[in-house]
């Protein structure tokens, strides 16, 4: 997997859900070996079995990994423990998709989560709507880093003006 000159132009390399599902956690290790100095995201959206699944991903030494918002708090602490066991400073991102609440966000902050990713479903017709933009703003106002992902086109960028989105994925 040679990314050529593209690797110099992107801020973060992502081993996405589909890639990891198709090829296994080994792709995280491969990317890390090929690009040791580039920030790396392992985006498997862990929802359960944090020690096992998280451990497999963390063996590849990603800088970031995602946990789906539907998980139990124990999943978060299990992945955190696996990172600590490996001496890693991997940041865990909670991906907001489907059902979650602002009370959940408060709990995640208490558990040490400092990054969220707000997902616009690829199965939802159209781009980001006013409700999603308002949610994104409210999350940012809560003092947590929020990334925006899913169905973002060049023409959509104006909708995000004035909102301190940490990054677009």
Predicted segments, located by residue:
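Short beta->alpha linker loops
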Residues: 19, 23, 71-74, 100, ...
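Conserved N-terminal beta1-alpha1 strand-loop-helix module at the mouth
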Residues: 1-42, 46-51, 59, 107
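Structural motif
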Residues: 8, 60, 111, 163-164
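Conserved anion-binding
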Residues: 49-145
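A C-terminal functional module that forms or caps the active site or interfaces directly
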Residues: 133-163, 168
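Hydrophobic faces of well-ordered beta-strands that scaffold small-molecule active sites
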Residues: 1, 11-15, 40-44, 65-67, ...
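Short glycine-enriched loops at secondary-structure junctions
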Residues: 44-48, 70-71, 153-154
